[in-house]
Swiss-Prot record:
Gene Ontology terms: biological process: trans-translation
Region entry Disordered, spans: 129-153
Name by which UniProt lists this protein: SsrA-binding protein
Source organism per UniProt: Geobacter metallireducens (strain ATCC 53774 / DSM 7210 / GS-15)
Gene3D superfamilies: 2.40.280.10
Record function comment: Required for rescue of stalled ribosomes mediated by trans-translation. Binds to transfer-messenger RNA (tmRNA), required for stable association of tmRNA with ribosomes. tmRNA and SmpB together mimic tRNA shape, replacing the anticodon stem-loop with SmpB. tmRNA is encoded by the ssrA gene; the 2 termini fold to resemble tRNA(Ala) and it encodes a 'tag peptide', a short internal open reading frame. During trans-translation Ala-aminoacylated tmRNA acts like a tRNA, entering the A-site of stalled ribosomes, displacing the stalled mRNA.
GO MF: RNA binding
Cross-referenced PROSITE patterns: SSRP (PS01317)
Predominant cellular place of this UniProt entry's protein: cytoplasm
Family: Belongs to the SmpB family.
């Protein structure tokens, strides 16, 4: 069946260095799955925390299902993630180190199951962000110059 992307967290790549990636399943309610299939989710400002050997996703906003009734889900509820115990322990060890956090990078369906890609992230300093922006600008200008040059010939 493959993968169907629901949403990306572009802000995470701007604010953090992503050192390692993990895939996790999510415990969801029926109306949340239907809302995700419609592509109504927001990963901005969300993060994952390990508590009592389990990992939870905070601030993931899934819009209420449009055709749901009064038993619709809470859009900002805490969602449990499903990972192997060894992966959770590895993440927990890294989170305890200063400067590391776990952020969701993208939300997608894989073979009909909702998955979230987590990134082990270290925060960028302001000068790192400026360097990244400079590199992007330079590559954009170079590509533009090449396009203009190829048009003139």
């Amino acid at each position: 069946m493959g993968e169907k992307l629901i949403c990306n967290n572009k802000k995470a790549f701007h604010d953090y260095f992503i050192e390692e990636r993990f895939e996790a399943g999510m415990v969801l309610k029926g109306t949340e799955v239907k809302s995700l299939r419609m592509g109504k989710a927001n990963l901005n400002d969300s993060f994952a925390l390990v508590r009592d050997g389990e990992i939870f996703l905070h601030n993931l906003h899934i819009n209420p299902y449009d055709f749901g009734n009064r038993q619709n889900h809470d859009p900002d509820r805490l969602r449990k993630l499903l990972m192997h115990k060894s992966e959770i322990e590895k993440l927990f060890g890294k989170i305890r180190e200063k400067g590391y956090s776990v952020v969701p990078l993208r939300l997608y369906f894989k073979n009909g199951l909702a998955k979230v890609e987590l990134g082990l992230a270290k925060g960028k300093k302001l000068y790192d962000k400026r360097e990244d922006m400079k590199k992007k600008d330079q590559s954009r200008e170079m590509a533009q110059a090449l396009r203009e040059r190829s048009k003139s010939h």
